[in-house]
Amino acid sequence: MASLLQSDRVVYLVQGEKKVRAPLSQLYFCRYCSELRSLECVSHEVDSHYCPSCLENMPSAEAKLKKNRCANCFDCPGCMHTLSTRATSISTQLPDDPAKTTMKKAYYLACGFCRWTSRDVGMADKSVASGGWQEPENPHTQRMNKLIEYYQQLAQKEKVERDRKKLARRRNYMPLAFSDKYGLGTRLQRPRAGASISTLAGLSLKEGEDQKEIKIEPAQAVDEVEPLPEDYYTRPVNLTEVTTLQQRLLQPDFQPVCASQLYPRHKHLLIKRSLRCRKCEHNLSKPEFNPTSIKFKIQQVAVNYIPEVRIMSIPNLRYMKESQVLLTLTNPVENLTHVTLLECEEGDPDNTNSTAKVVVPPKELVLAGKDAAAEYDELAEPQDFQDDPDIIAFRKANKVGIFIKVTPQREEGEVTVCFKMKHDFKNLAAPIRPIEESDQGTEVIWLTQHVELSLGPLLP
């Protein structure tokens, strides 16, 4: 029964740009293409940026300007948890009478997990609770900004040269004399969309502005390297004061060696993204814009459209001995679904991981529609499907248990079974053309899924 909850032991094959095998819970279903989609078959679009701590959302331009970090929230440099602002009272001298003191509120950053505080690295307390925390400056910031500006200008120059070469290939194949003779010169001189070759002759980076060329100084190698201190190899090392590799990599601009050099970092922003089918460009997933909302405007996950196969019980599997495995089929839609299991044909290019022979039920299986109210109604009369007890183990609501026979073909290793699942699907997506009176309201199509089961190791 433990295998019933291990949904990753049953994978479905996605026939996309690259063949992907994944559990049904990790896949999407495009109702317009009527095909499964994985995360590698969809386009990812960023909808909004937000801070996971204060839940403040911001547009993409502002997030890019802030380097995808929140201005008010910080991460602990020691354990990477969110820092909280603590308030304390300190005594300060009055400006009028230095002999007298008064109590004043001060704020500092503290971590509730590793007990790190901003006072450990000598950061001054603030008189306000939010903002105003000073950050250490990187000595190489000016050099990096200069290099970025230089390469941006260089990339813009190369783009202008490419555009000039493309438009230079466009030639007027009609001779000028022929054009002037029949009065076509004025017609050909009408303004066209885009820039002409003559206008590109004096094309610059910024039209109407003189942009100075940025020059950078090349990096120079240093002949002499600063030697290590004399006591570098002899002084004792206190491991509590040495930073870990993860702590150094989280601050690549400083890479602190000692714990006294650890400064808080602004918290990284998270995104809400939409997923779009690359084939038909329809949305498969679109969340709400509000960061506090966990709802979706569109969420076409495969478990809501494709019958789900799960392993309920696995007997002891032995080499070349037939065993009976109990599977469950779940119908996620509200209407009846007809399912037919088929064995993979010889030479099937998708059947590459199979290590056992499988015998599936030859008859068509009928799954009842999903009804949340009837699932908890014990007095409801069950529907009579005239099930064969040799094939159907049990039936409850929209679930049915079936038997398949497995014969391992290898003496060692994991046992993997592959088969095809053919089922009908009523496409409820909006049709492209209006439905005529003679047409039916919903179109029934038949889909075939390639399913692989991992049944575990063989017994000796």
Curated annotation (Swiss-Prot):
InterPro entries, A to Z: DCTN4 (IPR008603)
Compartments, as annotated in UniProt: Cytoplasm, Cytoskeleton; Cytoplasm, Cytoskeleton, Microtubule organizing center, Centrosome; Cytoplasm, Cytoskeleton, Stress fiber; Cytoplasm, Cell cortex
Domain of life: Eukaryota
Record-listed cross-link Glycyl lysine isopeptide (Lys-Gly) (interchain with G-Cter in SUMO2), residues: 215
GO (cellular component) term, any one: dynactin complex
Alphabetic keyword roster: Acetylation, Coiled coil, Cytoplasm, Cytoskeleton, Isopeptide bond, Phosphoprotein, Ubl conjugation
Residue ranges of coiled coil: 152-172
Disulphide-bonded residues: none
UniProt modified residues of type Phosphothreonine: 407
Protein name: Dynactin subunit 4
Organism: Pongo abelii (Sumatran orangutan)
Lineage: Eukaryota, Metazoa, Chordata, Craniata, Vertebrata
